[in-house]
């Protein structure tokens, strides 16, 4: 019998460490040819957009998809997980928190492999739901000592930083754009900005950048000048990046960047690509989000739910 897990169930079961391990395993499987990932498809109406990501991790025993709607009233996320050997439905998970944690985990895993040695200071643009996931996962992946956060809403930013500092025991403080970037070992962008968030001259040598908000051509968080200085330029999936990476698409269209220059995160994880080779060079990870990240994490949450006896039996029984 399949399980249905609510947001409340998922929050009880999902840990930061689980998210980091799941996302890294998904990228490893993809690099080793043990995964199938289909780029996001969208059906658009004036009021509502339906987004679907699908994929499979047969070595982990799962195949499935995430479907979510975006509307002025909010977003709604569901992940459907099937047994890859039998095709039987294993579970349906409400996936707002799950998606937040897997998105943050992708940038955190990339930082673990690409950030300069001894990284302890990070700057983050954004003080919303996804920014929180980035900060929590980054602090679990690396021994961060200080997080500087920049956002437009001053009151929201102050409350956001105070809450995370109290909950995490790491210094989290409000900052302006320049202070957020200067002297940061890692800089993350988690916004919907249509224009670059910081100037090239503010970045210190060797900084690692995580771009996670620019998943459409109309969005651009990181300037072309900054991107052209980065090596390597790492993506979660080249096909997905070529379709959605708003930071990269203008450079690709102008011929100032070529697809062959892009490196998939999984290739660095398995050692096929060396990753950072120059301590003074800037590195960049562009995160768009993959179905296999959701599936790997959902599988682990389902396993934990079965052990803990959480969740509801899915009410529909399919005829054989």
Regions found by a protein language model. Give the residues of each.
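Adenosine-phosphate binding glycine-rich loop
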Residues: 219-320
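Short helix-loop-beta connector
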Residues: 114-121, 143, 204-205
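Rossmann-like adenosine-cofactor binding region
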Residues: 169-253
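NAD(P)-binding Rossmann-fold cofactor-contacting core
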Residues: 141-165
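Conserved beta-strand elements of the Class I
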Residues: 122-123, 283
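Glycine-rich Rossmann-fold phosphate-binding loop(s) that bind the pyrophosphate
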Residues: 127-128
């Amino acid at each position: 019998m399949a399980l249905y897990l609510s947001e409340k169930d998922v929050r009880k079961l999902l840990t930061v460490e689980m998210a980091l391990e799941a996302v890294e395993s998904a990228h490893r499987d993809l690099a080793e040819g043990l995964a199938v990932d289909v780029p996001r498809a969208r059906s658009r109406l004036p009021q509502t957009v339906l987004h679907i990501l699908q994929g499979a991790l047969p070595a982990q025993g799962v195949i499935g998809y995430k479907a979510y709607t975006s509307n002025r009233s909010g977003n709604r996320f569901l992940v459907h997980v099937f047994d890859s050997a039998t095709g039987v439905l294993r579970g349906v998970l409400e996936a707002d928190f799950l998606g937040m944690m897997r998105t943050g985990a992708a940038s955190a895993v990339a930082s673990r492999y690409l950030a300069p040695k001894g990284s302890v200071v990070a700057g983050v643009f954004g003080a919303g739901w996804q920014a929180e996931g980035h900060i929590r996962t980054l602090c679990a992946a690396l021994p961060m000592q200080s997080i500087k956060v920049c956002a437009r809403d001053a009151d929201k930013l102050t409350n956001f930083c105070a809450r995370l500092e109290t909950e995490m025991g790491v210094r989290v403080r409000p900052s302006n754009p320049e202070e957020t970037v200067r002297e940061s070992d890692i800089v993350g962008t988690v916004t919907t900005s249509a224009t670059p968030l910081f100037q090239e001259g503010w970045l210190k040598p060797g900084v690692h950048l995580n771009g996670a908000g620019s998943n459409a051509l109309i969005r651009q968080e990181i300037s072309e000048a900054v991107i052209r200085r980065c090596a390597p330029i790492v993506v979660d999936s080249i096909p997905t990046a070529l379709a959605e990476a708003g930071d990269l698409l203008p450079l690709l269209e102008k011929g100032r960047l070529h697809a062959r220059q892009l490196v998939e995160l999984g290739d660095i994880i398995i050692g096929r690509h060396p990753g950072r080779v120059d301590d003074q060079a800037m590195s960049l990870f562009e995160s768009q989000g993959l179905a296999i990240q959701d599936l790997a994490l959902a599988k682990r949450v389902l396993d934990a739910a079965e052990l803990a006896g959480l969740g509801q039996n899915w009410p529909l029984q399919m005829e054989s």
